[in-house]
Amino acid sequence: MSRLDSLLKIFDQYPDDTFTMYGLAMEYISTKDYNIAEQYLKMIINKDSTYVPAYMQYAQLKENLNQLDEAKSIYRAGIDAAKKINDIRSAKEMENFLNDIE
């Protein structure tokens, strides 16, 4: 069974598990299935607005697809989420990424 298949099986059993969703998003990014990856990243953010790595990956995905306005917006939301939970390191990292594309 592939890693993707394993994650899908876990997701079927635990559809609210954001960690599994994140794993699925990363798998789909690695196979260049960007639309599916985006769906999982959106699901994570909708379920847990403080899941900071999802913002980072989602913004980077948009940046890599040259959708810079969307990437900027997602970075800003991620910075706010990181600050909300006092994750200063992640906030600073996303601020740096944002500055690079502005």
Question: What is the meaning of each model-derived region?
Answer:
Residues K9-I10, M43-I44, G78:
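Canonical positions in the second alpha-helix
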